[in-house]
Design a protein with these regions (language model features):
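Long, compositionally biased intrinsically disordered regions
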Residues: 432, 445-533, 671, 680, ...
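M16 family metallopeptidases and their MPP-like homologs
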Residues: 45-55, 81-129, 136-147, 174-199, ...
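His/Glu-based metal-binding/catalytic segments typifying zinc-dependent metallopeptidases
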Residues: 40-42, 49-51, 162, 166-171, ...
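Non-catalytic, conformational "gating/processing" segments within enzyme and secreted inhibitor domains
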Residues: 158, 210-242, 723-758
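A conserved hydrophobic secondary-structure block that centers on an alpha-helix together
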Residues: 72-73, 196, 200-222
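Active-site His/Glu-centered metal-binding helix of metallohydrolases
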Residues: 62, 66-70, 578
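Generic recognition of flexible, low-complexity loop/linker segments
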Residues: 94, 210-214, 273-276, 319, ...
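Non-catalytic terminal extensions that flank enzyme cores
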Residues: 1-47
Length: 972
């Protein structure tokens, strides 16, 4: 039987989607009206999603709350949290749900056929038959609820989405983004934040929430996607029988209307919060925003991505450089959102002054006029096109299955035209057209039409305001206090009872009967053998090469690693700056603009970074490398190596103006990253009180690095030559042949072809004096807190089990899954209201527990301290134990692209990890029993007794817990 024989479906279109090596089908389910798009191919990492068009009508976050709550139990699978049960007990390669401005999507992926079928069933039942209509507690837990524990206690608001969005709205970037869409689309859905504004989330009623669900969650409003190597006919028959045939077509009014263009540009101002003692100088965000066409235009869809690179994102791009030269902003960047009906292109200057708003706009317009008049740099256009095409062809999306990204790409057009899910995947022809257009005035005309003559635009200014967060907290506290005061004794009693009832609901586990309704694999379904390493040693001109014989589709992945273990701690801040600056300064043969363009024309990217590796065999030995990575088509290898050699051996650090621009840019981006990734920053900072690995992470990427960048910025203004000299000294010290190690990922033929080119580049490096001994370090304070302007916290507690005499075993990987999806999930997220909580036990002994967007502080630390008690009483039945084992294998066996396989092998080589050790740990996981987990209670207790904590977050919360800390300071 073929798809053509399925009477339940109408085939609207079928054709070969050659650019993604798939057979494409567009179907309509006749009875329900459901839309189905299929990409059938030989990829065993299968992907499914169901999406719904969900245009928000207000700022209460109802689409976001529904996304959270549909996955909290359903008719067929009535467990309280099937999402977590699947995370614990499936071999998924992706499992999540996402709320977009105009749609909500529920994707899953797996390489295991039965697992894939199970995931589809659970997700489809979740969206069509959720328990949200039966249990208001689900809405309260995930959305929002009043919390009152006693009649004399303070009335509060809690809820997972509520706290998530409090964290989001603490970020000026989030404030800017929401305000841009509000300014450009006042009359359609894009002016409303689908995630929810914390000020308005508590205005959402249970009834309005259910009405939104019933309105939009119907097959007639659905978009169903299947990708990969599967029996498509069987899946479609099952889909019809189990779900779609139960529904008749229903007219769903989910149409998104276009916003009519404006007669003139709109000017909007708003504010974001900084702490009371922060300076307001140079803290304003300025943006120049234009609506550009619609998302169904294949050429525009790609062309403005190229213009983003050519005009503002590439080093020395004309708009960026003009603004930087005028002293407007520390960081200037472009933004292009093509995933909505009317795409938006923006220029943004971060850390400017509000008084510069008019100048900001005039500089952009004058620069664009000059570009139109004289022509865009053709090399920049080609670089932008080649970069986009390389990324598309490589289809490397890190941990995400490429089929998922292809599917989400489909929705950029499919949502607005039922016949066009694949138009942005069939883009190689578009790239060819764009390449030809470089020699015409096509791009200049786009600038004139959409960026200069277009009145559908806005200028949004986001200013800092001291204590705005505190003002809002105080206003909310007063509002809640007044509300409580207006209540009768009976109403207060009801609030207390509701709070207690919700806690009891949260504490009551799902019944064993309900848990057994969830489909599950067995231990026998797990792959017995670990993925092998591929490390073959070779030597070229006395330089060791570790090659990884892996098929890489004609792309060479090469890393040059330089021993940096003898760099003093005082040099690490400069090394971090050096890492960020390399490739962005001019060289002997290239200006920094030409270098960036050539890199993107001839390679898939040249990147620099540092890599820290513990030596498993010798705990006192620490492998610290400076790493230069490049990816390149075999035919362009010589050019790629020439560009890399220029970067490493002839970078010019005497242009202190350029160094100043880079320092300001790094500082601005760190300010955003320290808050947005506060959980990881806090964990590393906490571990830096005892771990060399974490200390280096902090010095090169974290809080210590931010402090170093601030000092370097000051030094550049006072003694610029000293900074230039230090960077030049780092290059001279670091880039020596005797420090070099090369990693090569590609097949044997590719390596043999590359050897002459590698030898040629090696010969260009001098041999220097011997590498010195590992540097001494001074660890940070064990108990620290860092204050920012957010309304939530990131709470970390860390320790080291190897220092306490314990050994790493595979059971620790299992424990991580158990804690993440059971104890921590229930206590920190479900009961505590935090958006997330995670834990890790590294092979080198470092361990952490950390929360994400957490309304609590000391309560979360108490939860961590009770972990050993939980482990001691851990007594699951065989089914639950198997579930945890399957979830652990899911993380172990995530599919990898060639580059990731090479990196995994190289890490094992540097750390001294043998395949036998990995296999032993795998066996320990596969054969684990509850007593193996209980034995880890003392290990975890030893970790927690280290009592190393770090909190990043709200000033008032930190001050209330000041006794916990030895050091409290501002984050930024």
């Amino acid at each position: 039987m073929t798809i053509h024989d399925l009477a339940e479906y109408e085939i609207l279109d079928e054709h070969r989607v050659e650019d993604v090596q798939s057979d494409g089908f567009i179907l309509r389910h006749k009875k329900s009206g459901a839309r189905i798009a299929i990409l059938s191919n030989n990829d065993d990492n299968k992907v499914f999603y169901i999406g719904f068009k969900t245009p928000p009508e207000d700022e209460t976050g109802v689409p976001h709350i529904i996304e959270h709550t549909t996955l909290c139990g359903s008719k067929k699978f009535p467990v309280k949290d099937p999402f977590i049960e699947l995370a614990k007990g499936s071999l998924n390669t992706f499992l999540n749900a996402m709320t977009y401005p105009d749609k909500t999507v529920y994707p899953v992926a797996s390489c295991n056929d039965q697992d894939f079928k199970n995931l589809m069933d659970v997700y489809l039942d979740a969206v069509f038959n959720p328990n949200i209509t039966k249990y208001e507690e689900i809405f309260k837990q995930e959305g929002w609820h009043y919390e009152l524990t006693g009649k004399d206690d303070e009335l509060k608001i809690n809820g997972v989405v509520y706290n998530e969005m409090k964290g989001a709205y603490s970020s000026p970037d989030e404030v800017l983004s929401s305000q841009i869409y509000r300014s450009l689309f006042p009359d359609n859905t894009y002016s409303k934040d689908s995630g929810g504004n914390p000020e308005y989330i508590p205005k959402l009623t249970y009834e309005a929430y259910l009405n939104f669900y019933h309105k939009y969650y119907h097959p007639s409003n659905s978009y169903i996607y299947l990708y990969g190597d599967m029996d498509v006919v069987e899946r479609l028959e099952w889909l019809d029988k189990e779900y779609l045939s139960l529904y008749d077509y229903k007219k769903v009014n989910s149409e998104i209307n276009k916003q009519p263009a404006f007669d003139e540009i709109k000017n909007v101002e708003t504010q974001y919060s900084i702490t009371m003692d922060d300076s307001q100088e140079n803290k304003t965000y300025l943006s120049y925003n234009r609506v550009v066409g619609d998302s169904l235009d294949e050429m525009l869809y790609q062309a403005f991505d190229v213009l983003d690179y050519a005009l503002v994102s590439s080093p020395g791009a004309p708009v960026k450089q003009a603004l930087i030269d005028a002293g407007i902003g520390d960081d200037v960047y472009g933004s292009y959102d093509a995933g909505i009906l009317q795409p938006v292109f923006s220029f943004v200057a971060k850390n400017a002054n509000a008084s510069q708003a008019d100048e900001f706009e005039s500089i952009i317009e004058n620069t664009l006029k000059e570009v139109v008049k004289t022509g865009i740099n053709k090399e920049a256009l080609l670089a932008g096109i080649n970069s986009s095409e390389f990324k598309f062809r490589e289809a490397d999306f890190g941990q995400f299955p490429k089929g998922l990204l292809f599917g989400l790409n489909c929705l950029d057009s499919w949502l607005f035209d039922d016949m066009k899910p694949f138009i942005h995947l069939e883009c190689l022809g578009t790239f060819a057209k764009l390449r030809k257009a470089v020699d015409t005035d096509y791009f200049e005309k786009l600038i004139q039409e959409y960026l200069l003559d277009n009145t559908h635009g806005s200028s949004v200014t986001v200013k800092p305001k001291r204590g705005l967060g505190n003002e809002r907290e105080e206003a909310l506290a007063k509002e809640l206090s007044d509300y409580k005061a207006s209540l009768s004794d009976e109403e207060i009693k009801k609030l207390i009872e509701d709070t207690e009832h919700l806690k009891k609901y949260q504490e009551e586990p799902s019944s064993d009967e309900d848990l057994r309704k969830l489909p599950m694999l067995t231990r026998a379904d797990m792959k017995k053998n670990a993925m092998p390493f591929s490390n073959i040693e070779d030597e070229l001109l006395d330089v060791k090469v570790v090659r990884h014989d892996i098929e890489s589709n004609g792309i060479d992945y090469i890393s040059f690693l330089f021993d940096a273990g003898d760099f003093a701690q005082s040099e690490l801040g400069y090394l971090g700056f050096f890492t960020n600056a390399l490739g962005l300064v001019s060289t002997e043969r290239y200006s920094y603009t030409d270098l960036a363009n050539a890199t993107n024309i001839y390679t898939g990217g040249i990147s620099t970074g540092t890599a820290s590796h513990p030596d498993i065999k010798d705990r006192n030995n620490f492998v610290f490398k400076f790493e230069v990575k490049l990816k390149v088509l075999e035919k362009n290898l010589d050019k790629a190596l020439e560009l890399m050699e220029q970067m490493l051996l002839s970078s010019d650090f005497t242009d202190t103006k350029r160094l100043g621009e880079l320092v300001a840019q790094i500082k601005a981006r760190l300010q955003a990253n320290l808050s947005s990734s506060g959980h990881l920053v806090a964990a590393m900072r906490s571990m830096s009180s005892f771990s060399r690995y974490a200390l280096y992470q902090d010095e090169l990427k974290g809080i210590a690095f931010y402090r170093s960048i601030c000092r370097i910025e000051k030094e550049l203004s006072e003694s610029p030559k000293s900074v230039s000299d230090k960077l030049a000294a780092i290059a001279k010290k670091l880039f020596a042949r005797n420090r070099m190690l090369i990693s090569f990922t590609g097949n044997n033929e590719a390596y043999c072809n590359a050897k002459p080119s590698l030898e040629k580049v090696i010969a260009g490096f001098d041999k220097m004096s011997a590498v010195g001994n590992q540097a001494e370090v001074h660890f940070n304070t064990a108990k620290e807190a860092f204050i920012d302007a957010s309304q939530i916290q990131y709470v970390a507690k860390t320790g080291d089990f190897i220092c306490e005499g314990y050994e790493y075993t595979g059971a620790l990987r299992l424990l991580r899954i158990i804690l993440s999806y059971d104890y921590l999930w229930i206590n920190v997220r479900v009961k505590g209201g935090a958006y997330g909580c995670m834990n890790t036990f590294l092979r080198s002994g470092e361990s952490y527990f950390v929360s994400y967007r957490d309304p609590n502080l000391s309560d979360t630390l108490d939860v961590y301290d009770r972990i050993p008690e939980y482990i001691k009483s851990f007594s699951p039945d065989e089914r639950d134990m198997t579930k945890y084992i399957i979830g652990t294998f899911s993380a172990l066996d995530t599919p990898m692209n060639p580059e990731a396989k090479g990196s995994r092998s190289l890490s094992a080589y540097l750390e001294g990890i043998a395949y036998e050790q990995i296999q032993k740990e795998r066996n320990e996981i596969l054969n684990a029993q509850p007593e193996d987990i209980r034995r880890l209670a003392d290990l975890v207790e030893a970790v927690l007794k280290k009592d190393s904590i770090c909190v990043i977050g709200n000033e008032n919360m930190i001050k209330e817990s000041a006794g916990l800390f030895e050091n409290v300071e501002k984050l930024i």
